[in-house]
């Protein structure tokens, strides 16, 4: 289980976009794409077969997962994430929790 998944609210803790907040759009192994963060301009060649117009486009590039931290909604600060096992009706389930206060993420 990954500590950061799609849909999490995160804050950038290192790099040129330090302090910016956003929502995780994609997780790519050790990298994540965050909405509105690490935006770059790229030159796009036109491709009429695919219906792609040419020009300069802006797109979000991946950030290393070590440069972001999940945002705790209770404290509105960056927090560390842990994983613990919870037993419910004989089934063991892995859940993520905030290390600062122990509250379960997404519950």
Curated annotation (Swiss-Prot):
<dbReference type="Pfam" id="PF17136">
    <property type="entry name" value="ribosomal_L24"/>
</dbReference>
<dbReference type="InterPro" id="IPR005825">
    <property type="entry name" value="Ribosomal_uL24_CS"/>
</dbReference>
<protein>
    <recommendedName>
        <fullName>Large ribosomal subunit protein uL24</fullName>
    </recommendedName>
</protein>
<comment type="function">
    <text>One of two assembly initiator proteins, it binds directly to the 5'-end of the 23S rRNA, where it nucleates assembly of the 50S subunit.</text>
</comment>
<keyword id="KW-0689">Ribosomal protein</keyword>
<dbReference type="InterPro" id="IPR041988">
    <property type="entry name" value="Ribosomal_uL24_KOW"/>
</dbReference>
<comment type="subunit">
    <text>Part of the 50S ribosomal subunit.</text>
</comment>
<comment type="similarity">
    <text>Belongs to the universal ribosomal protein uL24 family.</text>
</comment>
<dbReference type="GO" id="GO:0003735">
    <property type="term" value="F:structural constituent of ribosome"/>
</dbReference>
<dbReference type="GO" id="GO:0005840">
    <property type="term" value="C:ribosome"/>
</dbReference>
<keyword id="KW-0699">rRNA-binding</keyword>
<dbReference type="InterPro" id="IPR003256">
    <property type="entry name" value="Ribosomal_uL24"/>
</dbReference>
<keyword id="KW-0694">RNA-binding</keyword>
<keyword id="KW-0687">Ribonucleoprotein</keyword>
<dbReference type="InterPro" id="IPR008991">
    <property type="entry name" value="Translation_prot_SH3-like_sf"/>
</dbReference>
<dbReference type="GO" id="GO:0019843">
    <property type="term" value="F:rRNA binding"/>
</dbReference>
<dbReference type="Pfam" id="PF00467">
    <property type="entry name" value="KOW"/>
</dbReference>
<dbReference type="GO" id="GO:1990904">
    <property type="term" value="C:ribonucleoprotein complex"/>
</dbReference>
<dbReference type="GO" id="GO:0006412">
    <property type="term" value="P:translation"/>
</dbReference>
<dbReference type="InterPro" id="IPR005824">
    <property type="entry name" value="KOW"/>
</dbReference>
<comment type="function">
    <text>One of the proteins that surrounds the polypeptide exit tunnel on the outside of the subunit.</text>
</comment>
<dbReference type="InterPro" id="IPR014722">
    <property type="entry name" value="Rib_uL2_dom2"/>
</dbReference>
